[in-house]
């Protein structure tokens, strides 16, 4: 009933869902008044609520560079209105056209796949609140719930990750419980991924193989994609998975340990000689919320869509206790009057008593844990790299 600028206008908070929902309501009522649609076909669970409505609106969307700010940003939201005996609930929408450098063409399916995935229950994996997360996303092209929906201008959006498939009930993941040699074909052909559990039930690491074929052909690289998950129902429900830079609850563990937007080609294992993920590697086997997972993955190899790797018995490495603390390139853990130190670089570390007496002085080697026995329980000072921190046994 109105022009695009009416439905695309923003409210006081910068959101256009209120007016866009009005558009969807008007469309739904026009369809109902036509008398040509049997709404029971769209109520799969027979609860008298239409399961969802999807609208592709004419013209372009606000999500593309240089778009008119009065166009509608594609989104999923809620709109309740009665249509005879039925009610509406969730809806999603996206644009007809794709705009790039002053040209326009029919939009690809990428944005549709992203918004439809919201309807299915998946959250965004980019930070939805920039003020609290900044550039907290590590996914970009790796997930359709981030920038991956725009691969090949939206005509070849990236396929779903292991967590996305697992969350939707489309595949199971196999928990690794014992050391051995493992083979992992590409997720798109074998529908399999491995899970490394932690002592925290809802925190774990996922291993999945990606090759540059099919829906994955426009990814930056191929190999073993390793991600960490720290599931929290409330955070998922509120669509705030990666809004906290210090608690990224679903993140890529990048093989090159570089999380900038322009180094995605180095995210998958193996890369540039890095073929392992342990508590002492760089990057470390630690989730985005700081949960250590002491299941060493080594000898990662990738060839022709298949990854092989070794799971090493954790008793073959020094076990880092769950109270892991990481500080400026050094990690330490204290238990049973012992402290274990591990550094990313060769550095000298000195432990002092509170009276200034030297308890131990050692030179740490990268990747080699050092265990020190403390004389008694109490407070100590740890000095390294011209830093002094207090530790409590």
Task: Indicate where each model-derived feature is located.
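Non-catalytic C-terminal accessory/binding modules of secreted extracellular proteins
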Residues: 21, 65-102, 168-318
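Residue-level detector of short, conserved catalytic/binding motifs and their immediate flanks
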Residues: 51-53, 108-109, 143, 203-205, ...
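C-terminal outer-membrane/trafficking sorting elements
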Residues: 321-393
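Short glycine/proline-enriched turns and hinge-like loops at secondary-structure junctions
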Residues: 138, 217-220, 343
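A mature extracytoplasmic/lumenal domain signature
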Residues: 59, 211, 230, 313, ...
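Active-site-proximal segment of zinc-dependent metalloprotease catalytic domains
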Residues: 1-138, 142, 146-154, 159-172, ...
């Amino acid at each position: 009933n109105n022009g695009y600028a009416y439905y695309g206008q923003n409210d006081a908070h910068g959101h256009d869902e209120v007016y866009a929902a009005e558009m969807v309501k008007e469309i739904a009522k026009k369809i109902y008044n036509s008398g040509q649609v049997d709404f029971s076909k769209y109520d799969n669970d027979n609860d008298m609520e239409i399961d969802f409505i999807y609208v592709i609106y004419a013209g372009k969307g606000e999500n593309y560079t240089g778009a008119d700010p009065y166009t509608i940003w594609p989104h999923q939201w809620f709109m309740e209105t009665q249509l005879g005996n039925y009610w509406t609930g969730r809806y999603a929408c996206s644009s007809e056209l794709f705009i790039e450098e002053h040209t326009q063409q029919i939009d690809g399916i990428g944005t549709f796949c992203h918004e439809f995935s919201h309807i299915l229950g998946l959250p965004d994996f980019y930070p939805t609140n920039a003020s609290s997360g900044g550039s907290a996303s590590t996914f970009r092209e790796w997930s359709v719930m981030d920038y991956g929906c725009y691969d090949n201008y939206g005509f070849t959006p990236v396929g779903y990750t292991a967590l996305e498939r697992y969350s939707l009930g489309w595949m199971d993941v196999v928990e690794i419980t014992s050391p051995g040699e493992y083979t992992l074909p590409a997720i798109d052909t074998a529908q399999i991924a491995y899970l490394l559990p932690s002592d925290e039930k809802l925190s774990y690491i996922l291993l999945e193989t990606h090759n540059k074929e099919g829906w994955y052909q426009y990814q930056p690289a191929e190999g073993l994609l390793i991600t960490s998950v720290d599931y929290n129902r409330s955070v998922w429900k509120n669509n705030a998975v990666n809004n906290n830079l210090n608690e990224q609850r679903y993140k890529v563990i990048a093989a090159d340990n570089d999380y900038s937007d322009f180094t995605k080609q180095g995210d998958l294992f193996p890369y540039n000689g890095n073929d392992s993920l342990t508590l002492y590697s760089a990057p470390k086997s630690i989730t985005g919320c700081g949960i250590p997972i002491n299941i060493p993955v080594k000898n990662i190899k990738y060839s022709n869509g298949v990854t092989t790797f070794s799971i090493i018995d954790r008793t073959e490495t020094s076990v880092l206790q769950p109270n892991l603390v990481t500080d400026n390139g050094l990690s330490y853990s204290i238990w049973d009057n012992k402290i274990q130190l591990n550094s990313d670089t060769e550095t000298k570390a000195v432990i002092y008593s509170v009276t200034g007496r030297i308890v131990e002085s050692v030179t740490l080697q990268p990747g080699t844990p050092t265990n020190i026995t403390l004389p008694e329980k109490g407070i100590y000072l740890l000095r390294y790299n011209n830093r002094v921190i207090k530790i409590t046994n």
